[in-house]
Amino acid sequence: MEQVVVIIGSTSDAQKVEPAIQILQEFNVEVGVYCISAHRAPDGLKHFVKKINDSGHTLVIIAAAGKSAALPGVIASGTIVPVIGLPLGGTPLSGKEALYSMTEMPPGVPVATVGIDAAKNAGLLAIRIIATQVSDLALGLERYYENLAKKSLEVNEQIHMQYAENRSSDHFQKV
C-alpha cells in the first residue's frame, strides 16, 4: 500500500482529485488512486479499508466525494488512519451537501475536511500529517511555504507599483 491512498466514489471524480495527486508527487509521496463507491460497493470498500489497515504502510487517506458524500465517513469508521474528506462540487447545491456531510460526523468518527474542490489543500494536509514523522518532508514543506510567501510578496510589490504609477496619472486625480 502507498503512503497516501486517494479514494474516489465515481470515475467522474477522477479529474477533480488531480491537484492532490500532483502536489503529493511533487513532494515524492507514494500515492495510489482507487475508485470504490460507498453506496454501490460497500462490502468492497470495507474489504479495501481492511487491506489498508493490514498493510500498516498507509499514513493518510484522502476520500473525495460529492452529493451525500458517505465515502469519508464509512472509511473513517473502519480505520485509525487519518481520513481527509474532500467535498466535491458540480452538484445542484454546489458541493455544500458534501461539505456538510463530511463536517457533521458523529463523535468517535473524525474526518478532517478541506474546502469544496480544494484537492491541492487535501494533498498538502496529507503531506503535513506525514511530515510530522518524516523530517525530509518537513524541510521540503518549509521550502514550499517560504517560496509561496516570496511569490505573494512579489505580487504585492507588482500590484503596489502598478497602482502607484496610475495614481500619478489623470485617471486617479480628483475632478
Go through the PLM ranges and name each one:
Residues 1-40:
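Glycine-rich phosphate/diphosphate-binding loop of Rossmann-like nucleotide-binding domains
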Residues 2, 28-31, 54-58, 81, ...:
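Glycine/charged-rich beta-loop-alpha catalytic/anionic-binding loops adjacent to active sites
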Residues 13-18, 42-45, 65-74, 93-96, ...:
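Short glycine/serine/threonine-rich phosphate/pyrophosphate-binding segments
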Residues 33-54:
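N-terminal beta-loop-helix "entrance" segment that forms/cooperates
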Residues 48-87:
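Glycine-rich phosphate-binding loop
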Residues 93-139:
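Short, glycine-/small-residue-rich phosphate/pyrophosphate-handling segment
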Residues 130-175:
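Glycine-rich phosphate/pyrophosphate-binding loop and the adjoining helix
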